[in-house]
Amino acid sequence: MKTVTEYQNKNVLVLGIAKSGYAAATLLKKLGANVIVNDGKPLAGNVLAAELQAEGMDVVCGGHPLELLERNISLVVKNPGIPYSNPLLVAAKEKQIPIVTEVELAYSISAAPFVGITGSNGKTTTTMLTFEMLKEGQKHPVIAGNIGTVACEVAQLAKENEVVVTELSSFQLMGVESFQPKIAAFLNLFEAHLDYHGTKKEYGLAKANIFKNQTETDYSIINADDADVMALSAYSKGQKVLFSTTKEIEDGAYIKDNALYFKGEKVVKVSDIVLPGKHNLENILAAMSIAKLLGVSNEAITAVLKSFTGVKHRLEYVTTINNRKFYNDSKATNMLATEKALSAFTQPIVLLAGGLDRGNEFDDLIPYFKHVKAIVTFGQTAPKLVRAAEKAGLDVIESVDTLDDAVVKAYAHSTDGDVILLSPACASWDQFKTFEERGDIFIQAVHKLI
């Protein structure tokens, strides 16, 4: 950890606890800050808040009183999930108090450089691929953020010869002040999180903050096939390295003659890649670009791609029952992810979809229903998905109350050789705590069929 003095004797407000808030508060206290912790949940039953209070921190729970800002606050470190429309944050902004997230704090103390990966879809897979390629290439990666350990905890232990690889959401990137990843990858942009950002434009600008502080000594990995990402890459002053699955990129990564190339050099044959789905070729090209820029050999990259079968809840193969293959794609929390999942198969598909209603319709899915023989919907968005399926002319359309019921119905509508796919196209929070919980319940329901 770098020697950092900027927080000493400063009054810092940590807004929202959870894992990242707890880690941020603990680190700030270690760095000599006067830490005030605020959480919307009541103190009763709030285990993390009670622990911080026991460590001598000032903990205020049960709401977000504006009076907290009267304590000469120098900095607000906020939980990524708390929107900037929160009255306390609005007031802090009016007072010109800097507002950051835990990742910014982690970067400020890290002795190791950062690789940051963002995009609407594919972040986790690309992050894991990058980590595995760097590990195979003996580049000493450590993984942080939404997967792995909280960034603050990783940064405290990271050494100069290591690389911090982190997946970054738009919520985290909105709080960028000085965060400067050595390599920043922007995978794609799709209309998502409009309940948080308001418009796709604002969502894209938040993502583009990953480039905000890059200089000509840094690298920006850009999806050349995504017009929105290409436009937002104008915010980068780093060296741009493009990747494409549709055309050759002279100074970037591309596919040619059934092989993946980087800057004109053949790296790996497509036939050596075991991870399914055309969309995953985009993720692989991005991860490969990062690995090559950091000096990983073609042999190490190939070794990873010959064995990497994917990330849990991302088009995860579950089992085969009576020649029906079940796949868990619970991480598909928006339409683009489901479009890519549907495009990964040529067999007839029985689709399970539905979840939290964020205000969007599902007509964009209609062109991807060509292999879908039946759909079973659940959750808040079930009626909207039914309307889209009717427009697509599907013959078999069902709505049920629970995911368990959806699995039973999906199996009943399947025949020999079908794929039964959970790819919800929606967030999970209407019925589940997380997409991971949703995926686990799907897997349990599938095994009950055996």
Swiss-Prot record:
Pathway connected to this protein: Cell wall biogenesis; peptidoglycan biosynthesis
Catalytic activity: UDP-N-acetyl-alpha-D-muramoyl-L-alanine + D-glutamate + ATP = UDP-N-acetyl-alpha-D-muramoyl-L-alanyl-D-glutamate + ADP + phosphate + H(+)
Keywords attached to this entry: ATP-binding, Cell cycle, Cell division, Cell shape, Cell wall biogenesis/degradation, Cytoplasm, Ligase, Nucleotide-binding, Peptidoglycan synthesis
Annotated Gene3D superfamilies: Mur ligase, C-terminal domain, Mur-like, catalytic domain, NAD(P)-binding Rossmann-like Domain
Compartment(s) of residence: Cytoplasm
GO molecular function: ATP binding; UDP-N-acetylmuramoylalanine-D-glutamate ligase activity
GO annotation, cellular component aspect: cytoplasm
Keyword Cell cycle: yes
Gene Ontology BP, a term: peptidoglycan biosynthetic process
EC number: 6.3.2.9
Function field: Cell wall formation. Catalyzes the addition of glutamate to the nucleotide precursor UDP-N-acetylmuramoyl-L-alanine (UMA).
PANTHER family tied to this protein: UDP-N-ACETYLMURAMOYLALANINE--D-GLUTAMATE LIGASE (PTHR43692:SF1)
Family stated for the protein in its record: Belongs to the MurCDEF family.
The protein's name: UDP-N-acetylmuramoylalanine--D-glutamate ligase
